[in-house]
UniProtKB/Swiss-Prot annotation:
Endpoints of the signal sequence: none
UniProt xrefs under InterPro entries: SmpB, SsrA-bd_prot, SsrA-bd_prot_CS
Entry keywords, A to Z: Cytoplasm, RNA-binding
UniProt keyword Cytoplasm, yes or no: yes
Protein source organism: Shewanella baltica (strain OS155 / ATCC BAA-1091)
Record carries keyword Cytoplasm: yes
Protein name: SsrA-binding protein
Subcellular compartments: Cytoplasm
GO cellular component, one term: cytosol
């Protein structure tokens, strides 16, 4: 019997903001949809996205992503002006927007895009993180912990092969 593909397959990652986890400590993550133009979807399919200097801000009860660079393809339509740094509206429920607004305004949190991925093969989604910026000593501690994990794995592997 042939096994059918699971409908809950892992989403295909388009882009990841690697600096986000280094610069911020996230307390909560959520998924948001994106309002995109046709040429942006084509460019995203080709992988021409950069999330490195990207952040989310709230204005008039809506969330917008700023700094997300989507490089237009050479074959993009000529009758549309392609702006690589156009603001992208995030599609969130009113409940989620109110929660984000409260935490950002009252407690000084930042909203940062962590990754962009395909959901069900057709919808572009963004994983956003709600967190606070790390101090320099926090970054050093994280680096030390990460290096220790690598060293520990190396020693365990060496013990396993020689022991």
């Amino acid at each position: 019997m042939v096994k059918k593909n699971s409908s809950k397959a892992a989403p295909a990652t388009i882009a990841r903001n690697k600096r986000a986890t280094f610069e911020y400590r996230f307390e909560e993550k959520m998924e948001a949809g994106l309002s995109l133009m046709g040429w942006e979807v084509k460019s995203i399919r080709m992988g021409k996205v950069n999330l490195s200097d990207c952040y989310v801000f709230l204005k008039n009860g809506e969330a917008f992503m700023h700094g997300c660079t989507i490089i237009p393809l050479n074959t993009a339509s000529t009758h549309v002006v392609c702006d690589p740094l156009r603001l992208k509206k995030l599609l969130l429920s009113r409940k989620e927007l109110d929660k984000l607004a409260g935490l950002v305004e009252r407690q000084g949190y930042s909203i940062i895009p962590i990754s962009m991925y395909w959901r069900k093969g057709a919808w572009v989604k963004v994983e956003i993180g709600l967190g606070k910026g790390k101090k320099d000593h926090d970054k050093r501690e994280d680096t030390k912990a990460r290096e220790w994990e690598v060293e520990k794995a190396r020693v365990m592997k060496k013990e396993k092969t020689h022991g």
